[in-house]
């Protein structure tokens, strides 16, 4: 059995759900213990290069689907990281209470090259425009009133059609 099986993000035989995040259709994207594993690896790397901080980009929209995106998890991990070694590593988590639209607005203010960022769970050459992360990305840009420079697949639904039935942020 593959390591971390049972998720559409780690198992090729499980299809990535399309549509907006709902508890049922997005359960397939939960990777067991993903953020604890990644934060542990990041902590080890930070210690090896003598960095004083690691950053964790969970945001408020993730909390309902992913238990390891809740503020309580981040607090517990911050404490564990401080206890993990004699060197102190701070876990910074600036977006834990922000929406994706808040993050897009701030990114636009800072000149983030959004065209070079990736959200799609399907992993093609272009963003699919149909999975939960693509829909939330489009919604965030729309709500933030920032032009989305992301190239989406030709068959992706229009922003107008998504706005009419799917927006939830």
How would you label these PLM feature ranges?
Residues 135-137, 141-169:
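Short Fe-S-cluster ligation motifs
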Residues 49, 115, 129:
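Structured loop/turn residues at beta-strand edges in well-structured enzyme cores
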Residues 19-24, 78-82, 116-119, 143-146, ...:
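Glycine-rich loops and low-complexity Gly/Arg-rich segments
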Residues 54, 121-127, 146-154:
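Charge-dense, low-complexity polyampholytic segments
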Residues 1-111:
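ATP-dependent adenylation/nucleotidyltransferase module used to activate substrates
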Residues 40, 118-139:
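Local cysteine-cluster metal-coordination motifs and their immediate loop/turn environment
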Residues 27-28, 84-89, 125, 149-151, ...:
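Short C-terminal domain-edge/linker segments immediately following a structured domain
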Residues 95-121, 159-167:
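Short, charged low-complexity linear segments at domain edges
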């Amino acid at each position: 059995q593959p390591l971390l099986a049972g998720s559409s993000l780690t198992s090729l035989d499980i299809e990535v759900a399309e549509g907006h995040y709902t508890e049922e259709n997005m359960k397939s994207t939960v990777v067991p213990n993903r953020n604890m594993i990644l934060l542990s690896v990041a902590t080890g790397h930070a210690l090896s290069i003598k960095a004083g901080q690691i950053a964790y980009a969970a945001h408020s929209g993730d909390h309902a689907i992913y238990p390891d995106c809740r503020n309580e998890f981040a607090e517990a991990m911050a404490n564990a990281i401080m206890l993990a070694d004699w060197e102190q590593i701070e876990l910074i988590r600036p977006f834990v209470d922000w929406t994706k639209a808040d993050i897009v607005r701030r990114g636009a203010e800072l000149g983030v090259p959004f065209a070079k960022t990736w959200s799609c769970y399907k992993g093609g050459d272009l963003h699919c425009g149909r999975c939960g992360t693509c829909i939330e990305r489009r919604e965030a840009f729309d709500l933030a009133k920032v032009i989305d420079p992301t190239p989406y697949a030709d068959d992706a639904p229009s922003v107008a059609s998504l706005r009419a039935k799917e927006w939830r942020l």
